[in-house]
Each structure stands twice: as structure tokens, then as C-alpha cells.
Amino acid sequence: MPAQGHRLYVKAKHLSFQRSKHVIHPGTSIVKIEGCDSKEEAQFYLGKRVCYVYKSSKAVRGSKIRVIWGTIARPHGNSGAVRARFVHNLPAKTFGSSLRVMLYPSNI
């Protein structure tokens, strides 16, 4: 039986920035986590690390892969979306792209 790979993260999508009718707040991103469909399920992910992994054209310290880190702050709505705050705001071109929600730090 072949060994299966184990992920330390859950896939998620970057939906939007937090916004009102006229004002956009790019410091807070709305993230939809796969398999998370209620506010109660979203509670598990509060405080977890989230990252956006992307590739650049120029290598820095031998790697073209870069990461923007953030933290899950609170639930957003009743359908399992969460709000995340990143160290550097995500660019708007990441709307719809994949994020990784790490399963650490654990609060179990």
C-alpha cells in the first residue's frame, strides 16, 4: 500500500476585501475555507495561520517562491467564511486564488 501525503493545511479561496457600500478596507480579507460551511465550524480556524504562496520572476536568496502570511481573525457571516488579516495586504489580483490555512497553532 503506497504512503499517502499528509497536508498540514486546508485549501481556501480569497473572496474579497472587507467593504461597505462605498469604502473598501484592504487590511482585512474575506476567505472561504473548503469544507467549512457554518459559523460554528469556522470557530475552529480562529487564530490559525493563513498564507498566500506565489512565484516571482526574480530569485531572492535562491528561491522564486514567496509567501504573504496572515492570521484568521473572526468569522464572517453564517456560511463559514472568515476574516483574515495579513502582514502585507494581499493584492487585488489574488481574488479567487488559492490560499493555505495552516492547522497550527492548535487550540485543542
From Swiss-Prot:
Q: Which residue positions does Phosphoserine occur at?
A: S98
Q: List the InterPro entries.
A: Ribosomal_eL33, Ribosomal_eL33_CS, Ribosomal_eL33_sf, Transl_B-barrel_sf
One GO term (biological process)? cytoplasmic translation
Disulfide bond residue pairs: none
**Which keywords label this protein?**
Cytoplasm, Phosphoprotein, Ribonucleoprotein, Ribosomal protein
> What is the annotated localization of this protein?
Cytoplasm
For this protein, the record's Pfam families field holds:
Ribosomal_L35Ae (PF01247)
Q: Does the keyword Membrane apply?
A: no
Molecular function GO labels: structural constituent of ribosome
- Please name the SUPFAM superfamilies in this protein's record: Translation proteins
User: Where does this chain mainly localize?
Assistant: cytoplasm
Q: Which domain of life is it from?
A: Eukaryota
GO cellular component labels: cytosolic large ribosomal subunit; preribosome
General function of this protein: Component of the ribosome, a large ribonucleoprotein complex responsible for the synthesis of proteins in the cell. The small ribosomal subunit (SSU) binds messenger RNAs (mRNAs) and translates the encoded message by selecting cognate aminoacyl-transfer RNA (tRNA) molecules. The large subunit (LSU) contains the ribosomal catalytic site termed the peptidyl transferase center (PTC), which catalyzes the formation of peptide bonds, thereby polymerizing the amino acids delivered by tRNAs into a polypeptide chain.
Any further remark recorded for this protein: There are 2 genes for eL33 in S.pombe.
Q: How does it assemble?
A: Component of the large ribosomal subunit (LSU). Mature yeast ribosomes consist of a small (40S) and a large (60S) subunit. The 40S small subunit contains 1 molecule of ribosomal RNA (18S rRNA) and at least 33 different proteins. The large 60S subunit contains 3 rRNA molecules (25S, 5.8S and 5S rRNA) and at least 46 different proteins.
Family statement drawn from the similarity comment of this UniProt entry: Belongs to the eukaryotic ribosomal protein eL33 family.
Q: What is this protein called?
A: Large ribosomal subunit protein eL33B
| Species classification | Eukaryota, Fungi, Dikarya, Ascomycota, Taphrinomycotina
